[in-house]
């Protein structure tokens, strides 16, 4: 009887541990925060933020999670130094005054074990607004080099930059909508 109780207790404990959130740290070399915006209707301007960090907690059994991704606005990289400097100015990001942007998502939608979307708040340019990032790809796998589980995917949203007080160029015909893409891979801790 005693062995049966010990076995049942261990089984119950293992089920509890399966239902707890699993923590991941974002892998910066496999994570990219990028944006795309139309340029006078002729082409698409693209940029990325080279410095970023963050963490993810996921409880697949409870279908819950939390993600926090912080990116440094002075690290904007369009491939054109003059444009990078202008984007850091008060016309756009005002990165001297607002050096970081942060997305914190706490509403996860799952389809089975796969994350389909994450809703949270994006703080940018001193303002916070809700954003839903939709997964276009999501997977978890056992990384053969790290010997740990890695989860990640591609998430995107179209945001109205004027909600964050970034309205430079509207009078010239620049659109207010920006395609935000967050490609993330995170390593189990």
Question: Language-model segments: what does each one mean?
Answer:
Residues 1-4:
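Positively charged n-region of N-terminal signal peptides that target proteins for export
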Residues 6-11:
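Sec-dependent N-terminal signal peptides
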Residues 14-17:
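N-terminal signal peptide c-region/cleavage motif recognized by signal peptidases
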Residues 19-189:
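Low-complexity, acidic/polar, glycine-enriched regions of mature
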